[in-house]
């Protein structure tokens, strides 16, 4: 039973992180308001300029008017190895949390193995025999 609960929780997390436009069909989403904070029905591939990488390693964006400009890289306060370490630490934390919850559920559902008490012949009620 707990396996089903864990599967449902994992699937609910996956579903809640999906893009809204994947969940809502285009016909329904076109009827919804498109103001700020609401669902956009436009295809993002039309608005996003395409990118290509030069052999030198520089990324270029193709602008809608046909021009190109060099893509600016974000400046991070952490270096690449530190970011990788942070990602691995978060993954490890999630895995440890899941395993500890599974262990706790296993401990709570495990039947206690108390030794069965055997009645000695002196303790038996003579009227029962």
From Swiss-Prot:
GO CC terms in record: ankyrin-1 complex; plasma membrane
TM ranges: 83-103
Residues in compartment: Cytoplasmic: 104-129
Keyword annotations of the record: Glycoprotein, Membrane, Pyrrolidone carboxylic acid, Sialic acid, Signal, Transmembrane, Transmembrane helix
Location of Pyrrolidone carboxylic acid modifications: 18
Superkingdom field: Eukaryota
Glycosylation sites: 29-30, 34, 40-41, 48, 56
Chief place where the protein resides: membrane
Extracellular side: 18-82
Topological type in the membrane: Single-pass type I membrane protein
One Pfam family per UniProt: Glycophorin_A
Keyword Membrane belongs to the record: yes
Keyword set includes Transmembrane helix: yes
Residues making up the signal peptide according to the UniProt record: 1-17
Localisation per UniProt entry: Membrane
Function as written in the Swiss-Prot or TrEMBL entry: Component of the ankyrin-1 complex, a multiprotein complex involved in the stability and shape of the erythrocyte membrane. Glycophorin A is the major intrinsic membrane protein of the erythrocyte. The N-terminal glycosylated segment, which lies outside the erythrocyte membrane, has MN blood group receptors. Appears to be important for the function of SLC4A1 and is required for high activity of SLC4A1. May be involved in translocation of SLC4A1 to the plasma membrane.
Membership in a protein family: Belongs to the glycophorin-A family.
Quaternary organization: Homodimer. Component of the ankyrin-1 complex in the erythrocyte, composed of ANK1, RHCE, RHAG, SLC4A1, EPB42, GYPA, GYPB and AQP1. Interacts with SLC4A1; a GYPA monomer is bound at each end of the SLC4A1 dimer forming a heterotetramer.
Protein name: Glycophorin-A
Organism: Canis lupus familiaris (Dog)
GN (gene name): GYPA
């Amino acid at each position: 039973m707990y396996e089903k609960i864990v599967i449902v929780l994992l699937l609910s997390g996956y579903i809640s992180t999906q893009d809204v436009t994947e969940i809502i069909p285009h016909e329904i989403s076109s009827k919804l308001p498109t103001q700020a904070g609401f669902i956009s029905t436009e295809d993002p591939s039309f608005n996003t300029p395409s990118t290509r990488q030069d052999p030198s390693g520089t990324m270029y964006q193709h602008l809608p008017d046909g021009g190109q400009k060099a893509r600016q890289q974000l400046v991070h306060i952490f270096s690449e190895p530190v970011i990788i370490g942070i990602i691995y630490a978060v993954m490890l934390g999630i895995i440890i949390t899941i395993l500890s919850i599974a262990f706790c559920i296993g401990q709570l559902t495990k039947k206690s193995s108390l030794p069965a008490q055997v009645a000695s012949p002196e303790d038996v009620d003579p009227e029962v025999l």
